[in-house]
């Protein structure tokens, strides 16, 4: 995959600017060729390619999954990129089958690529991640030293996640039996295990026995 500074939802319009944050994925099955670092300028005078990402594994399917995970582990701020678009392509059934042609994009995206299109299942995972991350921030705030006796802060475990005009009730508990967090929302249960630390922009967790990666951007009480 070639990671480009471009807006895939606007007919791949180049996105120029400075890479204010730039973290590349690492792994034994991952190779990256790049000529940029954090702080580099993506100029209108040159090709806006950021890097080339290669993955390998025993089978095509495994290599594709390695690629998806590697794309998820990129953290890029300052410019728009085609990272999500590439990940979306890699998850298409037609791509997995290998039966595609040079008209792949027009066939699969006749109305263009919608970067805001998120499946219901993925939205539920996002709600879980937002709940977990917010809980960690609240736990840290409640553990500040030198609190007045009798006024120690406690953290509740039931909140609302706001997604546009939607309000989703959520509940989170720490499970002492398996050191996981249990999140309940929309009459469903999710199990989360993560070693994520506050302040690190890349979030990784095993959610219902599947590894997920997310870029975390906190703005006040909002996450994106």
Go through the PLM ranges and name each one.
Residues 2-191:
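Catalytic cores of soluble metabolic enzymes centered on carboxylation/carboxyl-transfer
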Residues 10, 207-224:
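Structured, non-catalytic alpha/beta "coupling" segments that mediate domain-domain communication
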Residues 152-154, 165, 196-198, 207-209, ...:
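Short solvent-exposed loop/turn micro-motifs enriched in small/polar/acidic residues
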Residues 156-158, 180, 200-204, 213, ...:
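Short, acidic/polar N-cap/turn motifs at the starts of alpha helices
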Residues 161, 183-185, 205, 216, ...:
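Short aromatic-centered micro-motifs
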Residues 175-177, 199, 219:
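Structural motif
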Residues 188-212:
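A conserved acidic, glycine/proline-rich C-terminal tail/linker
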């Amino acid at each position: 995959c070639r990671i480009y500074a471009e807006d895939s939802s606007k007919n791949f319009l180049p996105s120029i600017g400075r890479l204010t944050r730039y973290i590349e994925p690492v792994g034994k099955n991952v190779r990256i060729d790049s000529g940029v670092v954090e702080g580099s300028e993506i100029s209108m005078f040159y090709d806006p390619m950021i890097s080339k990402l290669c993955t390998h594994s025993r089978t095509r399917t495994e290599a594709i999954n390695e690629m998806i995970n590697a794309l998820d582990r990129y953290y890029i701020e300052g410019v728009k990129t085609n990272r999500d678009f590439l990940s979306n392509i890699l998850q298409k059934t037609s791509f997995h089958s290998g039966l595609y042609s040079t008209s792949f994009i027009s066939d699969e995206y006749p109305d263009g690529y919608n970067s805001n299109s998120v499946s219901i299942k993925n939205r539920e995972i996002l709600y879980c991640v937002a709940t977990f991350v917010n809980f960690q921030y609240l736990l840290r705030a409640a553990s500040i030293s030198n609190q007045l006796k009798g006024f120690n802060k406690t953290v509740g475990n039931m909140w609302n996640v706001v997604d546009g005009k939607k309000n989703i009730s959520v509940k989170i508990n720490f499970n002492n039996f398996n050191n996981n967090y249990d999140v309940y929302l929309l009459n469903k249960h999710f199990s989360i295990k993560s070693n994520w630390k506050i302040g690190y922009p890349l979030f990784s967790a095993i959610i219902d026995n599947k590894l997920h990666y997310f870029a975390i951007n906190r703005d006040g009480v909002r996450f994106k």
